[in-house]
From Swiss-Prot:
Domain of life of the organism encoding this protein: Archaea
Organism: Methanosarcina acetivorans (strain ATCC 35395 / DSM 2834 / JCM 12185 / C2A)
GO molecular function terms listed in the Swiss-Prot or TrEMBL record: RNA binding
Gene Ontology cellular-component annotations: ribonucleoprotein complex
Record-annotated Sm domain positions: 4-72
PANTHER family, A to Z: SMALL NUCLEAR RIBONUCLEOPROTEIN, U6 SNRNA-ASSOCIATED SM-LIKE PROTEIN LSM7
HAMAP family referenced in this protein's UniProt entry, alphabetically: Lsm_RuxX
Listed InterPro entries: Lsm7/SmG-like, LSM_dom_sf, Sm, Sm_dom_euk/arc, snRNP_Sm-like_arc
Name of protein: Putative snRNP Sm-like protein
NCBIfam families to which the protein is assigned, alphabetical: PRK00737.1
Pfam families: LSM
Family note: Belongs to the snRNP Sm proteins family.
Length: 72
């Protein structure tokens, strides 16, 4: 059972996640890595606006300061 936020991220490694950012931006992709600051690495990522894909990336790094939530 996950007791801490980083445990949840660890359990979500190599699985699809949705990451909501400040400014109503959203990314969907496979979580490949994270650190204690919640900086995230997503592979096969898509940037979403209003539920529509606006950009695709083979890999993206998201700064933890901008993360509102991560949904596994």
């Amino acid at each position: 059972m996950a007791n801490r936020p980083l445990d949840i991220l660890n359990n979500a490694l190599d699985t699809p996640v949705i990451v909501r950012l400040k400014g109503a931006r959203e990314f969907r992709g496979e979580l490949k890595g994270y650190d204690i600051h919640m900086n995230l690495v997503l592979d096969n990522a898509e940037e979403l606006r209003d539920g529509e894909v606006v950009s695709k990336f083979s890999s993206v790094v998201i700064r933890g300061d901008n993360v509102v939530y991560v949904s596994p």
